């Protein structure tokens, strides 16, 4: 008799994420390794890793000083999220920031993509019933923290791998957000 394996929704998404990364000349495994290398260097503190990624992007010229401050403030608010109500406030703040940045003709595409991914991410509630909700309820922190770090680390890694080409940062940030979102669900 053939064994039944449970269906894992997370396996199919990786193919399209890899294709997106490859379209910008980024090797998915290298991007993932770069994010993990930064995490290992800075330790388990996700906020510290997020802040360092943003600062390095600003030092490299991928984001302006104003955008650096806005992204650091976004991270400060995001890492303070602990409930669904706080997440909704955070998401409305991120969406308002994204709208303001879209109106600014000088906004960097990297910062715009990062804020856009964060503002439009749907994070499932860790308190909802069901297998995913139960798994997430075991985690003590809100999954938006993983998404913030995934977007920042992915953008930084994409910039480094593409020779600081903004397209690499945009794709890296989007891919990092997707990977973090998938991992939050699985």
Predicted regions and their residues:
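N-terminal propeptides/leader regions of secreted preproproteins
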Residues: 1-141
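Membrane-active amphipathic alpha-helices enriched in small hydrophobic residues
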Residues: 140-186
